[in-house]
Amino acid sequence: MLEKYKNSKKLSRDLPQINDRIRFPKVRVIDDEGEQLGIFVPEEAIQLAVQQGLDLVVVSDKSDPPVCRILDYGKYKFTQEKRAREAKKKQHNSSIKEVKMRYKIEEHDYKVRINQASKFIQAGDKVKATITFRGREIQHSNLAIDLLNKMASDLNAIAEIQQAPSRDGRNVIMLLSPKKVS
């Protein structure tokens, strides 16, 4: 029972502040053309909006007094949702893709790893290049660092080193990220 009450209170807080839901003593009103009409008591501002057949919507409640706009709420809500969809479409969450290899890699296998890494980078993802060692191979970590530096120079056209080659336990790792297009 208590949780039901919590949720209903939360929902009422999330509702948009339009017309009778505006709970401020005074508001600054802007008409549908963008002109400031002045500071009003919410009841008067709502009457102005109703006379025009529109709604009074709180645009910014952070300022003092809060800014309200006289507009068609349905149209306003639609444009807000459209902007949110566009922003979501443009956003790309880059993840880290890993390319694993050994320090004694053959030339063809190395080229395959380079191709994999370049595909990941062109897709906008970061690439973590990892060279693993077994047993006493760890003595040859300098060869692994050289190999990772060669990989960085081969991908220099599309990627930049975010983290230089370094030892991490039984691995040598390097992090590459796509170059910023300016």
Swiss-Prot record:
It is found in: Plastid, Chloroplast. Keywords: Chloroplast, Initiation factor, Plastid, Protein biosynthesis. One of its GO terms (cellular component) is chloroplast. Pfam families: IF3_C, IF3_N. GO terms for molecular function: ribosome binding; translation initiation factor activity. InterPro entries: T_IF-3_C_sf, T_IF-3_N_sf, Translation_initiation_fac3_CS, Translation_initiation_fac_3, Translation_initiation_fac_3_C, Translation_initiation_fac_3_N. One of its GO terms (biological process) is ribosome disassembly. IF-3 binds to the 30S ribosomal subunit and shifts the equilibrium between 70S ribosomes and their 50S and 30S subunits in favor of the free subunits, thus enhancing the availability of 30S subunits on which protein synthesis initiation begins. Monomer. Belongs to the IF-3 family. This is Translation initiation factor IF-3, chloroplastic. The gene is infC.
